[in-house]
Amino acid sequence: MSIIENIKSPKDLKKLSRDELKNLCGEIRQFIIESVSQTGGHLSSNLGVIELTVALHFVFDAPNDKLIWDVGHQTYAHKIITGRKNQMRTLRQKNGISGFPRRSESIYDEFGTGHSSTSISAALGMAESLKKNKSKSKAIAIVGDGALTAGMAFEGLNHAGSTENNILIILNDNDMSISNNVGALNNYLTKLLSGKLYEGFKKSGKKVFSKLPPVLELARKTEEHMKGMVIPGTLFEEFGFNYLGPIDGHDLDVLIDTLSNIKYLEGPQFLHIATKKGYGYKPAENNPNQYHGIGKFDPELGLDQKKNTHLTYTEIFSNWIVKAAKTHSKLCAITPAMSDGSGLTKFAKKYPSRFYDVGIAEQHALTFAAGLSLSGFKPVVAIYSTFFQRAYDQLIHDIALQNIPMLFAIDRAGVVGADGATHSGSFDISFLRCIPNIILMTPSNESECTQMLSFGYQYKGICAVRYPRGFAASLEKKQLKKLTLGKAITLREGKKICILGFGPIINECIKIAEKMNATLIDMRFVKPMDEEIIEQKSKNHDLIVTIEENSIMGGAGSAVNEVLAKKNITKKLLIIGMPDQFVEHGTQEEVQKACGLDALSIESKIVNALSK
């Protein structure tokens, strides 16, 4: 029987010999490749942390020792070791296990980390609690995939280094976030990793640690505390950490020996390890970006390169910005470490001097864009809905308050699917429409998206275009209607029922409108809202229905209700959107159905509203 079949908890790991542990790493790696090929998920990141994960669970005593993973998509080996191997076939599927750590899922998942750069702060809070409870256990933050590039990580470092808490920060340095890491910190780490001392350590590290005396011997502590034991990590030492490394993150012996020694050191410790994203699977090693987050695939053949006849909204944005840059020399693009996911790869290659990947730094991205705009450039900020909320104060204080012109291209708005609650784009309409000076548009098809991006770029103010993950409905040019600020378009005239649609969800309503002889309106703008058409349709319809892929709390439906109240119109109103709860993972279709946003559910809700 294979070793992996006997691993039900970290305790089983501790019974294994070093050779068995190495074999287990190979089995876990093969299992993850086969498992993700069936479910989809984050592959390259997880292949890079298998040896580290095995070493951590072998040396430390989770959950007494606290392991916080950052970013959380690198936890597949952790899930397998902590008894969830058989559930991996349900990964990111409806009613299955999450692709991220989840406290409700396992006692070994200490902290939910879907967004990056939160682990150091959380680990420090836990370390402080352990100290107050007089515990010798450690809080350990495993920071990888570029999470150290965010300001919050440095806020945590700044605080942690000034304490005497037993916190260990492990930098899993794979030179990647989702896209390539950028910035001065990455350059600094690259210099550390390229040093001759590191090359020598890779060869002799095992010997160094094998000569160390038994656990708790003073000599070992003295040697461990020598500054710059391998390479001087001046930056981290200045923060107040005892810096160790860099070491080879794929050498299990070195990892176990190093962690075993660190285990008994007190105070803030910083271990720098070097890993390769996609390690052990050549297609992922050669193209870690492409294998970062993937769908189902054949492990023998790699990813399917077949093209769909329809464009995704991301591809629509990608094509638009490359074309727009030809005629607008002041156009520049900004993304917080999402150049591939946001569709900026082609732009970056064609216009490298006008492309800015600022790292996982959403707050900085927005205020940086403000500075560019005030200097005569027109920034286009490409950002996921779920990450946009990380820079809310910058949006309000630095941009909207000063009415600084720029365009926000908001990807992954609404139902996202398999990534679940941490990545759902449920809130952007609600948190954007309450801010003065912002125009907010919701395209429902390919042509409308292109129109709105062009309109938003040329507008002398702040515009946001929100669009979902997935393919866009196409529209013939002869059907295209002119885009006018704050004006909706009527797609179909009917009686009794008037459906006001915001975004692609309106396509679910076309057949419903025909079946029920309802009026169907593409609202196009959430802000400014077309108050005239709302007032007009409320006079000759019995029921107004709003539909959106956003939380019903403060969303577009609430905006319509405000218009009715403002104009003192009493009318039956049905608001359909995402419920007031965090949305679970599943396919987009499954999540839409669970939220009542599929055609059958929409029709049923309308029928029920009419009967009341």
Where are the regions that the model predicts?
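N-terminal amphipathic, basic-rich helices that act as targeting or association modules
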Residues: 1-81, 235-255, 269-272
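Glycine-/acidic-rich phosphate or pyrophosphate-binding loops and their flanking alpha/beta elements
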Residues: 230, 257-260, 292-293, 312-327, ...
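Structural signature of the thiamine diphosphate
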Residues: 215-283, 405-410, 429-478, 599-612
